[in-house]
């Protein structure tokens, strides 16, 4: 370990593993360490099931009705991949897709007046949907046509809207959309967690709705994908990429100290040895004095023996409960997957309800979601602090990732990755940087 590296990475969460992969592909010498004996950090999948019970201090362990412990891979952080989103792009560019198998999530649902409705995925579904009345549908269709044709580089498509100054509230007004449709559009399509976006320039919202539609167009059922064997497969896929390009991995490796000289990182000390480096990437748990708390998320993992009611017996789905429907500031989400994804025993389902904490009784906040899941065989409640770095790391060369937020997709995580890359490399992130180099010394032969 007593060696000189360009970059040392602490923690094998998804953000850290993707950055480690990119740095290795770009010719950097990388050492990647984790104090845990497993990959994934906060974003790991726990197996066998006995391990999950232990982690949540349920000492009696799983009953026999849960089947074989080894058949379970339970995500600690519930997220899906947008089919046309940035993480899929990263997987394709790096060819990490060859280590993973994905399934399309069967449906996306939205909560309205105590019931759940399928988010329409085709024009026919939209016309048949009970989510809105006849005239509302016509106006909504006009709005969707506007979004589909919108091109930020072609003012002819703006229809009198200025993407940089017109607020989204004004765009909704222009198409005369009612409150329910606005809730549905902002939260189930643009996937905002709160209503803060309404008074911001509309460009980002329009682009988010386009991303949803384009992702949906790829597979038809929903815009989301999920990897077989759980999300823990993602960091491992990128760790393989890093290793192929010469990255060194050490799990179960305690970090005793991060060594600084004149305010700059110069190395990491572990078990009496020092590895030197020019730059350091880590998750917040490794540098508690360089991060601040930015809120909390509650996630309740529920094991069920039945599909969720009114989802047409889907073996995977997402449910969004827009905040307006339950008098909150932030949406509540449910991600459900099952034995069909090799993450649970035969006939079992895993539904994870999550939201940003707003009160001193977080469990009560998630109740509307839990009511949709009854009866629940077993619950595991996790309340996590969200951390963000206190500075950009440019001076110390210590670059810290943000905690995983309450969103049900990876777009915010990818933004964090691109942002850290830019601060480390001094140049904007470009997907081309992730391409495997042809015929290089570490390149794998085609399968």
Curated annotation (Swiss-Prot):
Protein name: Rab GDP dissociation inhibitor alpha
A Pfam family the protein falls into: GDI
Function comment: Regulates the GDP/GTP exchange reaction of most Rab proteins by inhibiting the dissociation of GDP from them, and the subsequent binding of GTP to them. Promotes the dissociation of GDP-bound Rab proteins from the membrane and inhibits their activation. Promotes the dissociation of RAB1A, RAB3A, RAB5A and RAB10 from membranes.
A Gene Ontology cellular-component term: neuronal cell body
Keywords associated with the record: Cytoplasm, Disease variant, Golgi apparatus, GTPase activation, Intellectual disability
Complex and partners: Interacts with RHOH. Interacts with the non-phosphorylated forms of RAB1A, RAB3A, RAB5A, RAB5B, RAB5C, RAB8A, RAB8B, RAB10, RAB12, RAB35, and RAB43.
Domain of life: Eukaryota
Major subcellular location class: cytoplasm
Secretion signal, residue range per the UniProt entry: none
Disorder: Intellectual developmental disorder, X-linked 41: A disorder characterized by significantly below average general intellectual functioning associated with impairments in adaptive behavior and manifested during the developmental period. Intellectual deficiency is the only primary symptom of non-syndromic X-linked forms, while syndromic forms present with associated physical, neurological and/or psychiatric manifestations.
Tissue expression notes: Brain; predominant in neural and sensory tissues.
Coiled-coil stretches noted in the UniProt entry, renumbered to this chain: none
Membrane among keywords: no
Gene3D superfamilies in alphabetical order: FAD/NAD(P)-binding domain, Guanine Nucleotide Dissociation Inhibitor, domain 1, Guanine Nucleotide Dissociation Inhibitor, domain 2
InterPro entries linked: FAD/NAD-bd_sf, GDP_dissociation_inhibitor, RabGDI
Keyword Nucleotide-binding in annotation: no
GO BP annotation list: negative regulation of axonogenesis; negative regulation of protein targeting to membrane; positive regulation of axon extension; positive regulation of toll-like receptor signaling pathway; protein transport; Rab protein signal transduction; response to calcium ion; signal transduction
Location in the cell: Cytoplasm; Golgi apparatus, trans-Golgi network
One GO MF term attached to the UniProt entry: GTPase activator activity
Family, as annotated: Belongs to the Rab GDI family.
